[in-house]
Design a protein with these regions (language model features):
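A generic structural signal for well-ordered alpha-helical segments
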Residues: 57-58, 103, 159
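Conserved PLP-anchoring active-site segment centered on the Schiff-base-forming lysine
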Residues: 76-134
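Active-site phosphate-binding strand-loop segment of PLP-dependent enzymes
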Residues: 120-188
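Generic structural signal for small/hydrophobic residues in well-ordered secondary structure
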Residues: 35, 57, 74, 89, ...
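Acidic active-site catalytic centers that drive phospho-/nucleotidyl reactions
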Residues: 54, 114-116, 168-169
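Conserved PLP-binding active-site segment in aminotransferase class I/II-type PLP enzymes
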Residues: 1-84
Length: 189
């Protein structure tokens, strides 16, 4: 483990370089032009640029798209739409704490579902058992590590059969595919 407190500035930059995300600096002028358009419009949300993003993102995913300022806002809107107040929501055990906390904020009771070792995503076997035990109104499935949950097809089918509102968290899997389908195409939100 690297202790950044004991490294020189040069050593710190060298250590962090391995985590650098590639950025083509030739795009800098275009990026700043787009930021200026947003700032000049004085519309941080629901403006021309957001509409353009929603259109492009929806076309790329072949889904309807609605942009939110944060995942939390989008998740709360989906939970409200699903009518979870007073109901149970199933949540994978391997997720950021915001997932169950938002369910609690929406007035739901949270039950956790174990995750598989091979994909670190929700286990269908445990999901099925929890569905029959708790009769949830909704469920979160979180695609972890840049790939789609390996058992998403079974999870989504059981949700359809049981009338469970399925919310896919695809923040870690933009563009990832499973059996020819992109992340985000199995759930209700």
């Amino acid at each position: 483990m690297i202790n950044v407190r004991t490294l020189s500035e040069a050593q710190t930059h060298a250590s962090l370089d391995r985590f650098a995300i590639g950025f083509d600096h030739r795009d800098r002028a275009r990026l700043h032009e787009l930021w200026d358009r947003v700032l000049d419009s004085e519309r941080w949300s629901e403006g021309e640029m957001v509409a353009a993003f929603e259109s492009a993102w929806g076309a790329w995913n072949e889904l309807d798209a609605a942009a939110f300022a944060s995942w939390s806002g989008a998740a709360l809107a989906a939970l409200e739409f699903a009518g979870v107040r007073g109901e149970t929501i199933l949540c994978p055990s391997n997720t950021f704490m915001a997932t169950p906390l938002l369910a609690l904020r929406a007035g739901a009771k949270v039950e956790f579902v174990d995750c598989n070792r091979d994909d670190l995503c929700m286990s269908f076997a445990d999901f099925e058992e929890k569905v029959h035990r708790h009769r949830p109104r909704a469920a979160f499935v979180v695609h972890i590590g840049g790939h789609v949950a390996f058992e998403i097809e079974q999870i989504a089918e059981l949700c359809r059969v049981e009338g469970i509102f399925l919310i896919e968290d695809c923040a870690h899997a933009h563009g990832a595919e499973w059996n020819g389908r992109r992340a985000g195409t199995w759930g209700d939100a």
